Amino acid sequence: MTKISSSDVRKVAQLARLELPEDQIETYTEQLEEILSYVDQLQEIDTENIPPTTRAVEVVNSMRDDLVEVNCSREDLLNQAPHREGDFFRVPKIL
């Protein structure tokens, strides 16, 4: 098990730009020791025959094919515009 000292906690806090009150240093020291103890347990697991992965769950591409469908004619769409100029929508100038 990795032993964490209060100076280690102060150093990590400094690197993270955290201001820790002195009365909380001991609490964080104990918590970090528990976390690293858990990591040590994970290191003991045999992963020799486990294939590497990038995700916990297999991701399947569920997208459909992008098919072009004509629902309205160009003329129908242009006729719905409040302002039209030839084959274009006329919109207010924005500047």
Swiss-Prot record:
GO terms for molecular function: asparaginyl-tRNA synthase (glutamine-hydrolyzing) activity; ATP binding; glutaminyl-tRNA synthase (glutamine-hydrolyzing) activity. It catalyses: L-glutamyl-tRNA(Gln) + L-glutamine + ATP + H2O = L-glutaminyl-tRNA(Gln) + L-glutamate + ADP + phosphate + H(+); L-aspartyl-tRNA(Asn) + L-glutamine + ATP + H2O = L-asparaginyl-tRNA(Asn) + L-glutamate + ADP + phosphate + 2 H(+). It is an enzyme of class 6 (ligase). Keywords: ATP-binding, Ligase, Nucleotide-binding, Protein biosynthesis. It comes from the Bacteria. It holds the Pfam family GatC. This is Aspartyl/glutamyl-tRNA(Asn/Gln) amidotransferase subunit C. It comes from Prochlorococcus marinus (strain NATL1A).
